[in-house]
Curated annotation (Swiss-Prot):
Gene: VAMP712
Organism: Arabidopsis thaliana
Identification of the protein by name: Vesicle-associated membrane protein 712
UniProt similarity note: Belongs to the synaptobrevin family.
Tissue-by-tissue expression: Expressed in flowers, leaves, stems and roots.
Longin domain mapped to chain residues: 7-111
Length: 219
């Protein structure tokens, strides 16, 4: 699974979050929220080990996710843009005064649904390319997390690799099933075509023997 963790926060106040595996990403994400420089809008990524924390902040609302480094940047930032729009559309002005985790019970289900989509559905990346969204992602520099955390604050990122492998296995099975379905339909079409050709050949032979296409001497 490409995306393993996500949160939505106002400043350092976490409003909703979800982790798809056993990890301490939440603790590290909260450290990042406290250390993000400046007050303006930003798109930034921080790497740690084989994982990258991607951050999008717009109008004081921060959306963050942790993904495998091989997920690249387009899919994670497309995910963040999607989550930002859904969150603002759902809660509006309530965002500015909500208490910590006020939206967690409801919106964590949305996070789970969209993480599943952006991690496993190949259409997610295709749609992002067609829309031409997130052009600014090209300019996002991936920094090491040590650049914003003091040496004494840095925590080792712990990820349950068993759960991660299960996600990869699920994706492989899904792709295999899709491939098998494609092959099955192709074989069905080929079989139908051969049957049609065979029927045409039989008809031509019968029509020739019966002296005409309406089979006058055989009817």
């Amino acid at each position: 699974m490409s995306i393993l963790y996500a949160l939505v926060a106002r400043g350092t106040v976490v409003l909703a979050e979800l982790s798809t595996t056993s990890t301490n990403a939440s603790t590290i994400a909260k450290q990042i929220l406290e250390k993000i420089p400046g007050n303006g809008d930003s798109h930034v990524s921080y790497s740690q080990d084989r994982y990258v924390f991607h951050v999008k902040r717009t109008d004081g609302l921060t959306v963050l996710c942790m993904a495998d480094e091989d997920a690249g940047r387009r899919i994670p930032f497309s995910f963040l843009e999607d989550i930002h729009q859904r969150f603002v559309r759902t809660y509006g002005r309530a965002i500015h005064s909500a208490q910590a985790y006020a939206m967690n019970d409801e919106f964590s289900r949305v996070l789970n649904q969209q993480i599943e989509y952006y991690s496993n559905d190949p259409n997610a990346d295709t749609i992002s390319r067609i829309k031409g969204e997130m052009n600014q992602v090209r300019d996002v520099m991936i920094e090491n997390i040590d650049n914003i955390l003091d040496r004494g604050e840095r925590l080792e990122l712990l990820v349950d690799k068993t759960a991660n492998m299960q996600g990869n296995t699920f994706r492989f099975r899904k792709q295999t099933r899709r491939f098998n379905n494609t092959v099955w339909w192709r074989n069905c079409k080929l079989t139908l075509l051969l049957i049609l050709v065979l029927l045409v050949i039989i008809y031509i032979g019968v029509a020739f023997a019966c002296h005409g296409p309406t089979l006058p001497s055989c009817v």
